[in-house]
Amino acid sequence: MGNLFARKRRSRVTEQDKAVLQLKQQRDKLKQYQKKITLQLQRERELAKQLLHDGKKEKAKLLLKKKRYQEQLLEKTDNQISNLEKMVEDIEFAQIEMKVIEGLKVGNECLKKMHEVMSIEEVERIMDETQEGIEYQRQIDEMLSGSLTAEDEEAILEELEAITQEDLELPEAPSEPLPDTIPEKQAVKNKPKPQMIAAS
């Protein structure tokens, strides 16, 4: 039983799949970093407000400078995430294009083999022969319909009538002579009935 599970077919992972996975992992890490920076910016803004309220203007100003720098990092992170996502889309689309190209390649090979069996010259020859056959039959039809005279038509009708009559004629009587003896049953049937004598 263990061998059955050990021999389970493994899915094929290509280099493109690995690249896409790595890019998505980097994108996710950048998004986590963005989330962390955003929360930190919110805390620093609240802290700067508190420092101003306490009269510590210089410290608040220094904190806002740090906040501004982090905002610039956040903007760069957005650009990096966009680049990663675009790269993922490009790779995935390239994989689709490769499959399409492979399909076209197989189709072209199939067409080449078909063309080797049936060349253009062969197709033209068959079409010419077909057209010649149609033209020949048309000429025969024209000859049959146009060259017959009225006498020919009458002779054809007479022959057709004669053939029809032959099919309708009754079969001839048998040529063998009839038997001389009457069958026994027929003789009994024809035997005269006895006459009854009247009482005196």
Swiss-Prot record:
InterPro entries assigned to the protein according to its UniProt record, in alphabetical order: Snf7_fam
Listed GO CC annotations: ESCRT III complex; late endosome membrane; multivesicular body
BP GO annotations: late endosome to vacuole transport via multivesicular body sorting pathway; protein transport; vesicle budding from membrane
Ranges in coiled-coil conformation: 9-102
Subcellular location: Endomembrane system; Late endosome membrane
Keyword hit for rRNA-binding: no
Membrane topology: Lipid-anchor
Name of the molecule in the record: Charged multivesicular body protein 6-A
